Every structure is written in structure tokens, then in C-alpha cells.
């Protein structure tokens, strides 16, 4: 995987490396389980929402911007368990925030390889 100047060094866990994501998780379930109702998946999805300003009368509050390196680690953790197009898009967004155009290129390349290798097995 291409690293960029904003990447935080970490020891990759098994299958946390995007270069392994196009390999089946198991013979019985190549894409692993669908995590749609998994609490970690739902929490990650809620944190991927861009910050918005909320105003009620004189009260104003702006939610903090997402912590992209932390969100990327969470995407990788979930992608170890499941091949899900939504997770891949979230991971791609994290890579764009970390590396700009290089992150976009890397993310699209990984998504293409996953979809070619696992096709219809990838969860929506």
C-alpha cells in the first residue's frame, strides 16, 4: 500500500492491509458476514457524517470534524471481517483526507480489485 506523509505508522493486523482485501475471507462466505446491524459499523457510519452547525435561537454548536486517521483504522478493522462496498467508500474517503489525489487513486485501485475478485459477494 502506498503511504503518504500523513499516515500514522502501525503494525498491520492480518487482513488489515488493503492489498489483501480482494482475497476471500472464507470459502463459505467470501465476503464475510454483512455488518449492517453491527454496532461498530453503525457507530462508524454515524462518525463519517461531515460536521454541521446546529442553531437553536441564540445557541450555536458545531460538531468537530471527523478524526480521519482513527476512522481509517476502524474501517480497516471492519474490513478484516467483511467486504462491504460502504466500508470501502468510507476507507477511500479517509485515504483522500490523508493523501489527497494519491489517496483517491489508491482507494479506487483497491475498490476495483476487490470488486473484480469478489464481485457479487461484496455486501452492498
Identify what each model region corresponds to.
Residues 1-124:
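N-terminal domain-start signal
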Amino acid at each position: 500500500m502506498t503511504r503518504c506523509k500523513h499516515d500514522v505508522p502501525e503494525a498491520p493486523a492480518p487482513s488489515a492491509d488493503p492489498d489483501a482485501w480482494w482475497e476471500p475471507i472464507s470459502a463459505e462466505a467470501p465476503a464475510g458476514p454483512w455488518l449492517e446491524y453491527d454496532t461498530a459499523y453503525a457507530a462508524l457510519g454515524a462518525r463519517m457524517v461531515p460536521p454541521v452547525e446546529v442553531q437553536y435561537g441564540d445557541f450555536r454548536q458545531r460538531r468537530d470534524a471527523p478524526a480521519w486517521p482513527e476512522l481509517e483504522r476502524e474501517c480497516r478493522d471492519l474490513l478484516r471481517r467483511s467486504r462491504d462496498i460502504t466500508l470501502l467508500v468510507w476507507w477511500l474517503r479517509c485515504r483522500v483526507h490523508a493523501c489527497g489525489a494519491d489517496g483517491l487513486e489508491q482507494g479506487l485501485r483497491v475498490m476495483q480489485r476487490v470488486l473484480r475478485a469478489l464481485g457479487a459477494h461484496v455486501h452492498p
